[in-house]
């Protein structure tokens, strides 16, 4: 698998904020639709501020790409997760494991995939948006 990631705007010391992270979730969801992905698994990790038996704890769902942002917005409304959160992780994964878009716990974004359309599309979008982009192989 190949990885690309970003956590910074070029030439700035501040990391990505919640608005930038939400924009990248929307951008990735749009890219998924454009390349013909029909469904993805979206999830948020365990939130220690919620009771263990909360119906909102650790949400996970399989949705179409056009429902991705709505899933995360619902998690924000339910106080399970927040765009730009520094301690809680979330992700958008292929049900077959062929890619993972990871929203890290340090406001970092990582795409792991072998699909060059996804990697090239996000790399180009991030560079156009002025992000520092790192690349590595597993």
What do the PLM-derived regions correspond to, one by one?
Residues 1-138:
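Structured alpha/beta or helical-core interaction and ligand-binding surfaces enriched in interleaved
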């Amino acid at each position: 698998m190949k990885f690309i990631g970003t956590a910074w705007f070029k030439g700035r010391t501040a990391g990505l904020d919640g608005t930038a992270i939400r924009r990248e979730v929307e951008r990735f969801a749009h890219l998924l639709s454009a390349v013909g992905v029909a469904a993805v698994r979206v999830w948020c990790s365990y939130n220690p501020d919620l009771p263990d038996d909360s119906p909102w704890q650790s949400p996970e769902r399989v949705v179409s790409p056009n429902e991705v942002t709505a899933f995360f917005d619902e998690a924000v409304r339910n106080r399970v997760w927040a765009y730009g959160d520094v301690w809680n992780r979330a992700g958008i994964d292929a049900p077959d494991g062929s890619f993972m878009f990871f929203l890290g716990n340090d406001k970092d974004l990582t795409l792991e995939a072998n699909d060059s359309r996804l990697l090239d599309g996000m790399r180009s979008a991030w560079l156009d948006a002025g992000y520092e982009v790192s690349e590595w192989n597993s």
